[in-house]
Every structure is written in structure tokens, then in C-alpha cells.
Amino acid sequence: MDRSNNIYQKVTDEIIEALQQGCPPWVRPWRDGEPVFPINAASGRAYHGINVPLLWRSADKNGYENDRWLTFHQAIEAGGNVRKGEKSSLAVLYLPQEKEVLDSNGAPVADKDGKPQVRHFALVREFRLFNVAQCEGLPAAFFEPIAQVDAPQETAEAIRRYSGVPVIHRRQQRAYYYPSRDIVVLPHPEQFDSQAHYYSTLLHELTHATGHASRLNREAITSGAAQFGNALYAAEELTAELGSAFLCAHAGIPGRLQHASYIASWLQILQEDNRAIFRASGQARNACDWLLKQTEQPQRLSA
């Protein structure tokens, strides 16, 4: 097994273990108003993609209440150290790459439109992180509460409003995205057991909507091939679950598992393909980036 494939398998095994325990690593009992993307304590930058569920999983597994992380050397550079005997957590450096396709003579290969064919791949490297709770002697600022989102509900409503996707409320028990009509259909807000449940469901369905041909053009949404019970359908649901979790974290809304019944199908696709969770988390991040970018445009126009 090559180095990259071994990392893919390590990550997949972590996610599978969590799912088998009935604890998807993207579902966390967050407090209202508290954004909890894991961040690097030294740089202040948030971790993205597959590192988000990996670090959420480690925090839950080990009881860490702080979402700040750093490397062994960063702890020393900050004037502290990692306590003896502490175990590190897995994280991944994932660098998308592209390269022109060449024929046997070294000449570029063109596609049907005459443009050079490009092969997409990624450089994947494992690195290890420690939670600040595993360290001593660090600056007090590393342990200060993370600033809360001022208005979680308004943040979620802005994502809905600027997405451009019509949201229709009906007195029913189902929530879904209707690709052919490009609409989201939800029960009325008062039918949900909490405001957080309503918004996490809304953000789940809006993540599906980003797959429309006019947006990110995801196969599961545009091809019609995703049918309940097949792998493409399960993969799209995994993308939407992660997308909802990431958006809830951004808005400071407690996350919630939308479809516990899908756990078995997620386990199946992960056991068959150790890159499936990387694709799903990458698609979820792209969906979140697209939705959040729409909320920024009106602000730029009014500035």
C-alpha cells in the first residue's frame, strides 16, 4: 500500500469507527451562538475539509472542550509544551493538483473541444496535532472563549435569502430538495422541535441545491442517476450532512444528524471506497463556499 493510500485508509477507518458507534463525527452538541470550526491556535486559521470531522471526532472522543489545535513545534514556539504521554490526533494536508495529459510522444492530448486534457489528483500528507488542553505553559489567549456569532438565526436566514433558491413551507413531515423545479420544500418552522433543528434541516437541503446545473453541477443532482438506496444517492446525502454541519458551525447553530437511517449506506460506501469521505467533504466545502459567497456579494455592493 502506497503512502497516500495508507492515509486515505487511516482517515476512513476513523470515520467508520465513529459511524459504527452511532456517533457521526460531524454532529456535535454545540451551544447556540458558538462557532466551533477547529482552528490553529498559533495562526488563528480555521481547518477545512476532511480535517473538520477528524478534529471534531478527536475532540469528542477525548473530551476536549477547546477547538484550538497546534503542532508539537508550535506549542514550543509559543512558549509552552505538550505534556508527556499525550497522544496526537490525525490531520491531513490535502493539496489538489492538476497536470496536462501527454501521449506516448510527450505531446499534449486534446479533448473533444480541442483543449488540453488535464488530469486532476492530490498530494496527501499526514501530520499530527495536539489540542491546547494537552499542553501547558501556553499563552492565556489560547484558552479564551471564542467570540460568538452575534445573530445565528439571522446568519442562517441570510444564507437562505441570498442562495436564490425558493424555499416553500408545507404542513407535512418531509423536507427535500426538488431538482427539476429547483426548490426546497420544508415543514413549517413550528413543526420542528427546535429552531436549531429547523435551520440545520434548511441548510442540509440548501447544500443539495448547490448541486444544480446553474451552480456547482454535481452529478448526483443533475444526472438523475441518484436513486434511493444506491451509492450515488448515499454519497450525495453524506455531502449534504457535512455541508449542513459546516454551515451550522459557521452560523453558531447546534448541529443535528438529519438522517440516521443513512448510516448503514454511508458505512457501505466508505468500506468500499477509502476516498469517498474525501470527495464528500470536498464537495461539502465547495457547497458552503458557494453559499457563503452569495451572502458576501450584497455587502460588497452596499459598501
Where are these regions (language model features)?
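N-terminal accessory/interface modules of nucleic-acid-binding and processing proteins
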Residues: 1-303
